[in-house]
Amino acid sequence: GTIPAISRRQFIQAGSALAALPFVVKTGKVQAQGAAVSDTTPEEKVVQTCSTFDCGGKCDIRAHVSEGVVTRISTRPDNALDPQMPVMRACVRGRAYRKFVYHPDRLKYPMKRVGKRGEGKFERITWDEATTLIANQLKTITQKYGAASRYVHVGTAVSGGTFSGDKMVRRLLNLTGGYLESYHSVSMGNTAAATPYTYGTAASGSSLDTLLDTKLVILWGHNPTETIFGHSNHFYQKMKQNGTRFIVVDPRYSDTVSSLADQWIPLLPTTDNALMDAMMYVIVTENLHDRDFIQRYTLGFDEDTMPEGVPANESLMAYLSGAKDGVAKTPEWAEKITHVPAQTIRQLARDYATTKPAALIQGWGPQRHNCGERTARGSTLLATLTGNVGVKGGWAAGYGGCANRKFAAGPEMPDNPVKAKISVMNWVQAADDASQVTADVGLKDAEKLDSNIRILFSLAGNYLANQNPDLHQATRVLEDESKIEFIVASDLFMTPSARYADLLVPEPSSMERWNIGETWGTASYLILSEKLIEPEFERRSDYDWLREVAAKLGVEPAFSEGRDEKAWIEHIWEQTRLSMPDENLPDFATLQKTRQHLFKSAPFVAFEDNIRDPQNHPFPTPSGKIEIFSKRLYDMHHPEIPALSHYVPAHEGPEDALAKRFPLQLITWKGKNRANSTQYANPWLIEAQQQKLWINPQDAQKRGIAQGDTVRIHNARGICEIPAEVTPRIIPGVVAMQAGAWWQPDEQGIDKGGCANVLSSARITALAKGNSHQTMLVEVAKA
């Protein structure tokens, strides 16, 4: 049962050699094309599965299982690709999964904290002791503070599956009085909140098969080559082969730029709206805008199309011409702000406006700035001016979710008796001093909170500390045991967040449990994630031990409905079948053979009906039109929420006075070797992309920094020390590191792991009350 050690270099060499050979097996049998489960030897079976990490790919991982052990991982052979399915070839994360499953440092037993919270000192206890402790703490804390003192944190490591511990603990809490809910997605919550102010809905995306004849694609802060965002990269590569031109707007020369782009346009972070404003200025002053489209479908373009009750000079044309502030939004104006040459801005605007159709597709990185809502809406205004909304081959920009997406049903959730909701960004405040959580910072459905957070569940999540913006602010509250009285965490490893648990329990990997994987983006398919091997040591699924807790609280029959984990997956699948009779989903027994289901849908163009027949299909906005100017935003009277979504200098942006002290903008990217922080511990993947600070040669030279030097990245919130990567792939004035590295503080509190959240800000965005991880100013020096 032991797994022989193998280096990554040996792994790659072996893989390269095998790639040249036909797909053969020991017995001489060739695996049937497309077969999902096959017996290759009497001892070994090959099973199609997927991970349920916070990753949108849901790739075709082939687990080779022999005598209860995963011996290796492959992917679907190219000669067996299903023409009806997206290309599901497993990426480096999926191919390295076995090293994650069999890592010697995985948690093995339930443990109780014995040192100070955060020290990481624990002692082993039994499962009966663990579930009794949880049940007793729930009873005591609920009786003392009420159900609103109970909170469930983000469970990102299993968010790619339909069934997870964070969902089931919510079910348990709802059956026993409720809990304090949170809203907002830290991935895309800002754009999801902003896009409806233009279109009336966040679902502004089309299916990717409508783009195959698109002549120009602008990827704005989007990096699908590395992130594997729902397999869109395969569509883009096919489009490029067919002659589509790609322009990438990004401060960093990403792998997407190197593999797709005909042109790279770098800009200073947080200045996106200035670039967009200048593009719109060029488009309207050169009469490149789609006048008929604007006249028929929009509100707020000029003074003649403004809503009632708004004074003069608030329209888009008035803003661009400088009628109110005396500043015309010319490319020369934008060049000083963005550092994009004026002529490049002019050409980008002309290319976008005159190429029909064209698609401006935003990634979610730019909207994770404290100006992110404005950036998201700004892209929708550009799409509107050029008439690229509701047409095949165009793209409405903004959030980009697809309205025809279909999802599996989840476990049924009883009503929550606690009505108050907080933004996920408010949890530290709610734990520290609940009176500070008001409507101004995101409290919903209540005038005030009834209690501080006193008991917290963090199941399969590293957001408690590592992924939380302004990590030190969060850990100060976590370390104060008079605040949160009991923290339950489950994980595969002793992550930086797990160290703050009072009770820490070992979780199985996705190969040791049942689930259904769902894709992101527009790759609408479901894939079965079967329990392939038994968990070792005393690892148990969250649901399994939650049943014990439910029994000790007297609600087990209502909680489990008599189902084990596999029965829940079968139930969820059957509920999904019933909810989609037109899909003809197979029954569960058949699914266990076919392994996957691709949703049947014709090419889908967002807002096609609204454009084709606006009388019978008005936009779901107050005016029934595309709202270039939003009266709803105007009535908020907030300087950071302009009704037109134009450029406003960001807090900690390049124009902030703080830039004199901390002159470099730090951004992070999602890399190829992990999903957020998940798989950080995988030794193969650590080698695949080392944690370094990208710094431009000009900035490095000023600071006496050479390639490979350890550098100190610091601001008022924290200090981080990692090696420098001196490269022209990042523009001057900006530095970058990969997101998701584990926090590793030394005795002085200096992070040696490259965790950007020791430097990031917990400032919430003005409209969505969301996260702005990406907006931070730093200085860099040789350590």
What is the meaning of each model-derived region?
Residues 131-150, 207-216, 326, 347-359, ...:
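Glycine-rich phosphate/diphosphate-binding loops that line cofactor/substrate pockets in enzymes
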Residues 254-355:
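Long, well-ordered, tryptophan-enriched scaffold segments
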Residues 1-288, 459, 701, 746-783:
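N-terminal export/assembly segments and adjacent metallocofactor-ligating motifs
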Residues 181, 289-292, 345, 359-360, ...:
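Acidic/polar loop patches that form or flank catalytic/metal-binding clefts of enzymes
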Residues 311-433:
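Active-site phosphate/pyrophosphate-binding segments
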Residues 1, 165-249, 273-274, 336, ...:
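Extended redox/cofactor-interaction regions of prokaryotic respiratory oxidoreductases
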Residues 542-591, 678-679, 683-693, 698-783:
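Long, contiguous, secondary-structure-rich segments that constitute the structural scaffold
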Residues 208, 511-535, 545-552:
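Glycine/threonine-rich phosphate-binding loop and adjacent beta-strand/alpha-helix elements that clamp
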